[in-house]
């Protein structure tokens, strides 16, 4: 046996201890601000890597999309079936200012609406708002039993479905093309568009559970920071009180006239 150096004993231990570094020391938190169309203005926080050299932290935040439940934004549990998408557009200090970027309903809500014996009618269309937002809106509706109906099912005919779908598209165009995006969101949240569809389609076939299923933004206009800050600014009321003008005394007027004569 050759006598020599044992290579194994001279080598250091395999997989030595590595330095444990806390990843969060390189991160920082930013507050998320929702537009004033929602009740809760600060809806959460987001994490981003700190500014290192030319790589700015704000560049990593711009364009981030956050999906928030509408029940959390409006403090209303009845709106828990809707999800709102907000996109980060502008950062000031540690505040991220967001804008509306989409809407959808939850999967469990959609599954709870679909039933046997009823017809599901869906219509979608591309619309353009006054402030040049290009949207794709999806509307769904379900047939409803007529009063005093003995038949267990209530299926609509193909001709009726086509008429209802056309009405849906026309109403969505009429409601969206004449308003700003913020006003359209205010219409979608309380389902005023769905109620209008239900009202106008009543003569064709009675409907129920008519709602905007999804809103997708296809194209956004160029970012205008002044308009974005208007969405986040609260209108300030003038706190000053009206002061009544006091009538001048006769003595004061006599002194003034005497000075003018001299």
From Swiss-Prot:
One Gene Ontology biological process: translation
Chief localization: cytoplasm
Keywords tagged on the record: Cytoplasm, Ribonucleoprotein, Ribosomal protein
GO cellular component, one term: cytosolic small ribosomal subunit
Subcellular location(s) per record: Cytoplasm
Keyword Ribonucleoprotein: yes
Membership in a protein family: Belongs to the eukaryotic ribosomal protein eS1 family.
Subunit-structure text: Component of the small ribosomal subunit. Mature ribosomes consist of a small (40S) and a large (60S) subunit. The 40S subunit contains about 33 different proteins and 1 molecule of RNA (18S). The 60S subunit contains about 49 different proteins and 3 molecules of RNA (25S, 5.8S and 5S).
Protein name as annotated: Small ribosomal subunit protein eS1
Native organism: Plasmodium yoelii yoelii
High-level lineage: Eukaryota, Sar, Alveolata, Apicomplexa, Aconoidasida
